[in-house]
Regions:
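Alpha-helical transmembrane segments of multi-pass small-molecule/ion transporters
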Residues: 1-321
Length: 321
């Protein structure tokens, strides 16, 4: 029964996000009180991610060091560069532009690992990239935000770095430690973490919308266009670079997904903490869109594999005749 509830919540998360968004525009006072709790909720998600990691995941980093390094560098070059280009191309106002920058400068999100599994990508590489990107995030994310946006908004580098350490790195490492010492108990908790993560995303989106409903109504379509282009830039350039570096099919799929999908929950949280609620809009929309685009890409990959399998069977049958 519990597994069915978890599957339902994760499967229909995107619908839940849209519904809470509409609800929060008309009744903003309901979700506003949850806003101060978002950093804590994000920390619990990262704690859950840590509990899902095993010693084998860390070993995989050393099995594919070159590919993990390529993915990490691409993650922190392509998405920030795409954000920089898009905010200038669309001439976004600073309060909205900072949200796009935050999305671009954050590490990959854990949803990428699920999408990689569905797409029959290299899941071990995907998990390794997410893990390494997340560990580097406290230092790289504030620096990139300062580099891109420091000229037009005030960036408190040290404070942002410490916030990411507290919300992301420490919970992650504590989760890893608990999983190492108490693996049996952790297995039970891990079954409900996907549902909890989905609920936190829904709450975060509700808070962002409740605090910036007017801005969304005035600029929503433009922000949606920027978010879609941002995600597509990441996936297309990630795919192109992976091919150029000679990665195989499964690795290329993992790189495509990993570079294009971001920890948008962290982006929205940082926007609410350090800038304005309007800065969280891009992250809120990205939370929905990257799951849609990721699922579409996974379906495309599965379809391609099925076609290739059919062609192989036909060729084999012809040869036998």
């Amino acid at each position: 029964m519990l597994s069915l509830i978890v599957r339902f919540c994760t499967k229909y998360m995107s619908i839940g996000v849209v519904l809470i968004g509409i609800f929060s525009i008309f009744w903003p006072e309901v979700m506003k009180p949850f806003a101060p709790k978002i950093p804590t909720l994000l920390g619990i998600i990262m704690f859950g991610m840590g509990m899902s990691l095993t010693p084998g995941d860390f070993k995989n980093v050393f099995k594919q060091p070159k590919n993990v390094a390529i993915g990490t560098v691409l993650q922190f070059i392509i998405m920030p560069a795409a954000a920089f280009a898009l905010i200038h191309l669309f001439a976004l106002p600073p309060e909205i532009a900072i949200g796009v920058v935050l999305v671009g400068c954050c590490p990959g999100g854990t949803a990428s690992n699920v999408i990689s599994y569905i797409a029959k990508a290299d899941v071990a590489l995907s998990v390794s990239m997410t893990m390494v990107n997340t560990i580097f995030a406290p230092f790289v994310t504030p620096f990139l935000v300062w580099l891109i946006a420091g000229a037009w908004v005030n960036i408190d580098f040290m404070s942002m770095m410490m916030s990411i350490v507290k919300m992301v790195l420490l919970p992650l490492l504590i989760g890893v430690g608990i999983n190492y010492f108490f693996p049996r108990q952790v297995k039970k908790v891990n079954t409900i973490m996907p549902m909890f993560s989905a609920l936190v995303v829904i709450i975060t989106v509700g808070c962002v919308v409740s605090l910036s409903g007017r801005t969304i109504l005035d600029n929503g379509l433009v922000i949606l266009a920027v978010v879609i282009l941002h995600n597509l830039c990441g996936m297309l350039l990630g795919n192109f670079c992976a091919r150029r570096f000679g990665l195989n099919k499964a690795q290329t799929r993992a790189m495509t997904i990993e570079v294009g999908m971001q920890n948008s929950g962290l982006a929205s949280t940082l926007a609410l903490m350090y800038f304005t609620a309007a800065g969280g809009i891009a992250g809120a929309i990205f939370s929905v869109w990257h799951n849609v685009s990721g699922s579409l890409f996974a379906s495309y990959c599965v379809g391609k594999d099925e076609e290739a399998e059919k062609e192989t069977k036909i060729s084999s049958a012809v040869e036998l005749k």
